[in-house]
Amino acid sequence: MIQQESRLKVADNSGARELLVIKVLGGSRVKFGYIGDIIVATVKQATPGGVVKKGDVVKAVVVRTKQGAHRADGSYIKFDENAAVLIKDDKSPQGTRIFGPVARELRDKDYMKIVSLAPEVL
């Protein structure tokens, strides 16, 4: 469950290390973001020489949450951290590598490029 002011780790090599959520996209009544949701965030920590800098406002998709997700077959998946991947306007990732596992729900929400770059899909 990601909400305004939540801090997320960045799971790609775009240069950002930590994000602060400004807004969860999807309408005025959407308060919480889950796996596969798009967020608008600002970069709080960045690596030197990266594509994005500290203070940049970016869009990202949530790939891991501590709260987890219920699946149609009755199973439940949760991760150890909240993480996101920075995306461009056409929903393709800004980085060229994805670190750590991502949830299978991203495939259903049409983020195939992120799923193909990820080392593990759970």
From Swiss-Prot:
GO terms for cellular component: cytosolic large ribosomal subunit. The keyword GTP-binding does not apply. GO terms for biological process: translation. GO terms for molecular function: large ribosomal subunit rRNA binding; structural constituent of ribosome. InterPro entries: Ribosomal_uL14, Ribosomal_uL14_bac-type, Ribosomal_uL14_CS, Ribosomal_uL14_sf. The keyword Oxidoreductase does not apply. Keywords: Ribonucleoprotein, Ribosomal protein, RNA-binding, rRNA-binding. Belongs to the universal ribosomal protein uL14 family. Binds to 23S rRNA. Forms part of two intersubunit bridges in the 70S ribosome. Part of the 50S ribosomal subunit. Forms a cluster with proteins L3 and L19. In the 70S ribosome, L14 and L19 interact and together make contacts with the 16S rRNA in bridges B5 and B8. This is Large ribosomal subunit protein uL14. It comes from Pediococcus pentosaceus (strain ATCC 25745 / CCUG 21536 / LMG 10740 / 183-1w).
